[in-house]
């Protein structure tokens, strides 16, 4: 209501003056307000010059009033435009305030989502640590099995050396028996009738020796079969261990890479959004200073931005920690591969030595088994000397001990 009355007063103020009567009234009012009544003269003293001067002054006053009315109209229009602009600016600020509130809510939801993702990443990390501990335990058990197999290999090699020495002893005895056979061949025809009983006894002893040799050969074949079973079990264990390590580490590395990539993409998108919002906040900083509510919301948004930056720094540190753990796992995996390759090389060397070795023979009495030794010497071809060769650098060793020492140094 007061605004309507004020507009009516303004419209009355800006109305143009009517005529001379109104001019005289205005002059009278001016004189009543304290101004000197210069034009209020008695009629008997009026002259044309005085009347002309009064008319000129009246015209000047009318022009001044018209100019003042024009200025009042312009000021009124400016005031109306200012009110409209203030109303539009208020609506614009309210719209921006609603947008900022929605944006803060959306950022809060994204913050909760990132917090859940971080918790999931922590759970995955705990699972990875447990898997790593399990792998370390499996590695220790496999190392213990490899150590036991190496001990069995060394024991087999020592047995092989003992059998080689026994074979050399038997060869010497065979040579001595051959000499005795040549000496006894000359006497055989003379003593054949006298020693028929002894020949029967020797034949029986020969049969017993052959039975003992067959039992020894069966025992040697059984040991070979057990050794082959151990080799097959070791090879299968190595394959299972290798496949288990490859599958588990491949899946873990792929999951870690995907999680890291997702976290990086989320951080990049969040940083772009934060930069964009920061630019908009800088642009509307002057406008927001006039509105206390928006200023409080901006302070809240700034606190959220600082929290998001702190969370982003923590995520970056977490990413670096995961990257270091990934590199450590890769180094351990490479060490395991190198150890497996070395074990495979030792196994190949052991297989070569087992294939080149011969089954041991039992020593037989010289005076009871010369017929059997002579027949074996005639049937069997001459044996080749053992090949003590390094499988890596082809080094020719004089004996098995030297070859073992060289192989360990060559592998290291």
From Swiss-Prot:
One of its GO terms (molecular function) is protein heterodimerization activity. Zn(2+) binds at residues 390, 393, 406, 410. Residues 49-343 form a coiled coil. Residues 242-343 are annotated as: Ubiquitin-binding (UBAN). Residues 249-412 are annotated as: Required for interaction with TNFAIP3. Residues 246-358 are annotated as: Self-association. Residues 44-111 are annotated as: Interaction with CHUK/IKBKB. There is a cross-link at residues 111, 139, 143, 226, 246, 270, 276, 278, 285, 295, 302, 314, 319, 392 (Glycyl lysine isopeptide (Lys-Gly) (interchain with G-Cter in ubiquitin)). A zinc finger (CCHC NOA-type) spans 382-412. There is a cross-link at residues 270, 302 (Glycyl lysine isopeptide (Lys-Gly) (interchain with G-Cter in SUMO)). GO terms for cellular component: cytoplasm; cytosol; IkappaB kinase complex; mitotic spindle; nucleus; protein-containing complex; spindle pole; ubiquitin ligase complex. Residues 315-336 are annotated as: Leucine-zipper. InterPro entries: CC2-LZ_dom, NEMO_N, NEMO_ZF, Optineurin/NFkB_EssMod. Residues 150-250 are annotated as: Interaction with TANK. Residues 1-197 are annotated as: Required for interaction with and ubiquitination by MARCHF2. Phosphorylation at Ser-68 attenuates aminoterminal homodimerization. Polyubiquitinated on Lys-278 via 'Lys-63'-linked ubiquitin; the ubiquitination is mediated downstream of NOD2 and RIPK2 and probably plays a role in signaling by facilitating interactions with ubiquitin domain-containing proteins and activates the NF-kappa-B pathway. Polyubiquitinated on Lys-278 and Lys-302 through 'Lys-63'-linked ubiquitin; the ubiquitination is mediated by BCL10, MALT1 and TRAF6 and probably plays a role in signaling by facilitating interactions with ubiquitin domain-containing proteins and activates the NF-kappa-B pathway. The keyword DNA damage applies. GO terms for biological process: anoikis; B cell homeostasis; canonical NF-kappaB signal transduction; defense response to bacterium; DNA damage response; establishment of vesicle localization; negative regulation of endoplasmic reticulum stress-induced intrinsic apoptotic signaling pathway; positive regulation of canonical NF-kappaB signal transduction. Residues 375-412 are annotated as: Interaction with CYLD. The leucine-zipper domain and the CCHC NOA-type zinc-fingers constitute the UBAN region and are essential for polyubiquitin binding and for the activation of IRF3. PANTHER family: NF-KAPPA-B ESSENTIAL MODULATOR (PTHR31553:SF3). Homodimer; disulfide-linked. Component of the I-kappa-B-kinase (IKK) core complex consisting of CHUK, IKBKB and IKBKG; probably four alpha/CHUK-beta/IKBKB dimers are associated with four gamma/IKBKG subunits. The IKK core complex seems to associate with regulatory or adapter proteins to form a IKK-signalosome holo-complex. The IKK complex associates with TERF2IP/RAP1, leading to promote IKK-mediated phosphorylation of RELA/p65. Part of a complex composed of NCOA2, NCOA3, CHUK/IKKA, IKBKB, IKBKG and CREBBP. Interacts with COPS3, CYLD, NALP2, TRPC4AP and PIDD1. Regulatory subunit of the IKK core complex which phosphorylates inhibitors of NF-kappa-B thus leading to the dissociation of the inhibitor/NF-kappa-B complex and ultimately the degradation of the inhibitor. Its binding to scaffolding polyubiquitin plays a key role in IKK activation by multiple signaling receptor pathways. Can recognize and bind both 'Lys-63'-linked and linear polyubiquitin upon cell stimulation, with a much highr affinity for linear polyubiquitin. Could be implicated in NF-kappa-B-mediated protection from cytokine toxicity. Essential for viral activation of IRF3. This is NF-kappa-B essential modulator.
């Amino acid at each position: 209501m007061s605004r309507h009355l004020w507009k009516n007063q303004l419209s009355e103020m800006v109305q143009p003056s009517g005529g001379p009567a109104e001019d005289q009234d205005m002059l009278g009012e001016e004189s009543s307000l304290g101004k000197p009544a210069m034009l209020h003269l008695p009629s008997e003293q009026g002259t044309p010059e005085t009347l002309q001067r009064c008319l000129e002054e009246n015209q000047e006053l009318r022009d001044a009033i018209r100019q003042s009315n024009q200025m009042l109209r312009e000021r009124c229009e400016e005031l109306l435009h200012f009110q409209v602009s203030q109303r539009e600016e208020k609506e614009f600020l309210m719209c921006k305030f609603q947008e900022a509130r929605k944006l803060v809510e959306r950022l809060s939801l994204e913050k909760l989502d990132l917090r859940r993702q971080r918790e999931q990443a922590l759970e995955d990390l705990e699972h990875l640590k447990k898997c790593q501990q399990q792998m370390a335990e499996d590695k220790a058990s496999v190392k213990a099995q490899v150590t036991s197999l190496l001990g069995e290999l060394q024991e087999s090699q020592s047995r092989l050396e003992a059998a080689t020495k026994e074979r050399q002893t038997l060869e010497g005895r065979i040579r001595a028996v051959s000499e005795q056979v040549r000496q006894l061949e000359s006497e055989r025809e003379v003593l054949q009738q006298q020693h028929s009983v002894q020949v029967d006894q020797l034949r029986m002893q020969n049969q017993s020796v052959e039975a003992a040799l067959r039992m020894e050969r069966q025992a040697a074949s059984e040991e070979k079969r057990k050794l082959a079973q151990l080799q097959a079990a070791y090879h299968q264990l190595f394959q299972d261990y290798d496949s288990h390590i490859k599958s588990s580490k491949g899946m873990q590395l792929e999951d870690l890479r995907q999680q890291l990539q997702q976290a990086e993409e989320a951080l990049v998108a969040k940083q772009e959004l934060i930069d964009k919002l920061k630019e908009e906040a800088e642009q509307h900083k002057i406008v927001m200073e006039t509105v206390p509510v928006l200023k409080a919301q901006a302070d809240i948004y700034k606190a959220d931005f600082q929290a998001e930056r702190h969370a982003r720094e923590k995520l970056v540190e977490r990413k670096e920690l995961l990257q270091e753990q990934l590199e450590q796992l890769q180094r351990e995996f490479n060490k395991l591969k190198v150890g497996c390759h070395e074990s495979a090389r030792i196994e190949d060397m052991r297989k070569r030595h087992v294939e080149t070795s011969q089954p041991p023979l039992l020593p037989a009495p010289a005076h009871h088994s010369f017929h059997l030794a002579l027949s074996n010497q005639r049937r069997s071809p001459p044996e080749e000397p053992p090949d003590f060769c390094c499988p890596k650098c082809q080094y020719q060793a004089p004996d098995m001990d030297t070859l073992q020492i060289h192989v360990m140094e060559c592998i290291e």
